Amino acid sequence: MNHDTHYNCKLQYDTVRFCTSSDNISLIKGKENLVKHTFDIETGEVTSMEFNSQANQANRNIVPFSLYIRVNMQSKRMIIEFSSKLLLEDYPLLISEDTFPQALRNMERLGICKLDVESIIEDCHFNKLHATKDVDMELTESILNTLNLYTGNYRKYKWIHYMNEGIC
């Protein structure tokens, strides 16, 4: 199969955000200072950890593109958001089902954390996907209603068919 054709028929994203278990991450010894920690005042236990590549110059020097990791120890959940630039030289392929594992492994190569890539792939739930091209599909009332549910401030928008070929 032609490599370009294979990737062009898949959904591709420029930015993704997903939620997974906090058990799927561990910090690398000696890199803890790159991560912001929040502590419970009474117990002294870490309640959350956060890495934001845009937070300061030191983080931007390590990760010159968008990467956000937030780990909540209390809820045992973790949110990760990154751009397709995490794919490095494969950036033009964008984030897809095929390149998502590579992006996670590249995140590990940054030296901030270790990830259980297989577990993340198994249990993650995406809550933000920036699509990079139109999706050809029939727009039914059910689909339009679902889009309303997944759109922030849904009361602000009214989905309507645009010349029977799209929505606005």
Question: What is each model feature region?
Answer:
Residues 1-168:
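Structured, helix-rich domain cores that form ligand/interaction pockets
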